[in-house]
Structure formats: C-alpha cells, structure tokens
C-alpha cells in the first residue's frame, strides 16, 4: 500500500536529517577519515570488503565496527578485539563468500564465525555495505518499534531468553529479507524523485526512532 503524502514527507525529512557519523579509519596511516556523506563511507567499505587481498577484507570488516560503534565509548576496544582475534582462514572464507553472496546471506556470513559478527545487527551491516541499494541494516534501534501499539514486521523476530542481541536463524533471516524488500518497495514506488536506495529508507526510519518519533515510524512500516 503506497504511503500517504504526509508519510512520504515525514520519511524524506527524516532521511535528510540522518546524522550518523560519516567516518572510517585509515589503518595504514592510523587516522580517522571523515567523508562528505554516507556515499563515501559505502564506497570505501564496499571496496575493502570486495578486495582481492585479505588485509583489505580485514580493514573493511574493522571499518564496519568502527563506523557502527562511532557513538559508543568502547568502539576502539571492539575494533582491536576483532583485529586480534580474526584468523587468516576466516578472512579467506569471508573474501570468497562476500564476492559471490546472493540473497540476504546473513546465515552464510554468520557461519564464517568472524569475531564481533555474530548477531543480526552487525552481520546485516556487512550485507548492506555490499549492496546498499537493495540491502539494509536491522539493528536494536529498529527493534524498539515492537514497543509501539502498531504491529510491524519486527514483531516477527524471534529471540532466545535473555538475548542481548538479535540472533541469526532462518526465521530471522526471512524477517530481514522482508524488511529489505519493504525498504526497496518504498524507495522504488514512493520515493522515486529522491533517487533513494533501500538503505536510505532504512536510515530514515532509524532517524525517526532516534528522534522520538517511533510511532510515526511504525505507521510507515506497517503501511508500506
């Protein structure tokens, strides 16, 4: 069902206000890089993930952690842990998989066993950076929409008792794929003039939740 004009306007405004830090890290020269927009972040990380060198893949995965934890104090610790714990074999397997990945792929990525990449939040970030026009992130911020009085796709996620992250299983992979499809549908049918991809729609919903406008976000997700 197409979004109303009011819903489209609210979503486009949220997309424009999305303000997550556009940063990566240059691990060779040991300095942070600030990009003009998320397009720069996407281009750099995708290039690293699809590099023919395992050190490039390692840097791409480390940069997903660096970007994803940009507003959290233990970011550098998580990045360091990953770099110390990831094995050459895991990087070889990841390089082979990421270059040929089809579909949602989050179960396949999880099976590689990369440290720091066990839950759906960060594994979906890997998938998103490979193809941001078609794949998006599903993280804890979006799970908060389950608290709204409107049923959304996120109500279909399954959690183990006392889970602190979104587990990856076949059922949740199916929910993730439906979420990606929903974002693609909004981008192609409702927001054609904005030249947006699926990830821009997801970032708009994320921004709405972060800006205490979760009810409107839930209405959009339930309508589309």
What are the roles of these predicted feature ranges?
Residues 50-54, 112-113, 128-133, 169, ...:
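Short, charged/polar micro-motifs that form catalytic or ligand-binding hotspots
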Residues 42-43, 87-88, 120-121, 161:
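A generic structural signal for ordered alpha-helices
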Residues 68-73, 131-134, 209-213:
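Short alpha-helix boundary/capping elements
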Residues 107-147:
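Catalytic DNA-binding helix-loop module of base-excision-repair DNA glycosylases/AP lyases
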């Amino acid at each position: 069902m197409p979004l109303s004009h009011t819903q489209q306007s609210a979503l486009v405004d949220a997309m424009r206000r999305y303000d997550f830090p556009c940063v990566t890290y240059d691990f060779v020269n040991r300095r942070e890089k600030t990009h003009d927009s998320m397009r720069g972040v996407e281009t750099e990380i995708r290039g690293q993930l699809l590099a023919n060198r395992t050190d490039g893949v390692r840097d791409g995965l480390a940069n997903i952690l660096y970007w994803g934890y940009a507003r959290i104090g233990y970011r550098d610790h998580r990045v360091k842990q990953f770099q110390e714990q990831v094995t050459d074999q895991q990087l070889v397997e990841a390089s082979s998989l990421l270059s040929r990945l089809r579909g949602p792929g989050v179960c396949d990525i999880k099976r590689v066993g990369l440290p720091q990449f066990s839950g759906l939040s960060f594994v979906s970030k890997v998938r998103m950076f490979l193809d941001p026009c078609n794949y998006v992130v599903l993280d804890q911020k979006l799970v908060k929409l389950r608290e709204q009085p409107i049923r959304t796709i996120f109500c279909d996620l399954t959690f183990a008792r006392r889970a602190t992250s979104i587990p990856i299983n076949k059922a949740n992979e199916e929910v993730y794929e439906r979420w990606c499809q929903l974002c693609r549908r909004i981008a192609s049918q409702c927001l054609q003039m904005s030249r947006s991809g699926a990830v821009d729609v997801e970032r708009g919903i994320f921004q709405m939740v972060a800006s205490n406008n979760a009810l409107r976000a839930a209405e959009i997700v339930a309508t589309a």
